[in-house]
Amino acid sequence: MTKRTTIAARRVGLIDLGKATRQTKGLTQIQALDSVSGQFRDQLGLSAD
């Protein structure tokens, strides 16, 4: 993760993976991390490819 991405992630409050995992309790930890990655991409306007 680039420094810029990390700063942007902190700004939108998604850097707390523990919080993200709690919010997606029905998913495995890996799926929760995938979900957070998708949120990062959406927030930063990157493609999902």
Curated annotation (Swiss-Prot):
A GO biological-process term: defense response to bacterium
Pfam families linked to this entry: Subterisin
Keywords: Antibiotic, Antimicrobial, Cytoplasm, Isopeptide bond, Secreted
Keyword DNA repair: no
Primary location class: cytoplasm
Result, substituting residue 38 to A: Decrease in cleavage by the isopeptidase AtxE2
Cross-link (Isoaspartyl glycine isopeptide (Gly-Asp)): 26-34
Subcellular location(s) per record: Cytoplasm; Secreted
PTM info: This lasso peptide is hydrolyzed to a linear form by the isopeptidase AtxE2, in vitro. The isopeptidase AtxE2 only recognizes the threaded form (but not the unthreaded form).
UniProt-reported outcome of changing residue 39 to A: Decrease in cleavage by the isopeptidase AtxE2
Dependence of activity on temperature: Unthreads upon heat treatment.
Chain residues in the propeptide: 1-25
A GO CC term attached to the entry: cytoplasm
Comment block on domains: Is composed of a ring composed by 9 residues, a 5 residue-loop (SVSGQ) and a C-terminal tail. The peptide is threaded when the C-terminal tail is inserted throught the isopeptide-bonded ring. The loop region serves as a recognition element for the isopeptidase AtxE2.
Purpose of the protein: Shows weak antimicrobial activity against its phylogenetic relative Caulobacter crescentus. Does not show activity against other bacteria tested (E.coli, Vibrio sp, Burkhoderia thailandensis, and Salmonella newport).
Protein name: Astexin-2
Organism, as annotated: Asticcacaulis excentricus (strain ATCC 15261 / DSM 4724 / KCTC 12464 / NCIMB 9791 / VKM B-1370 / CB 48)
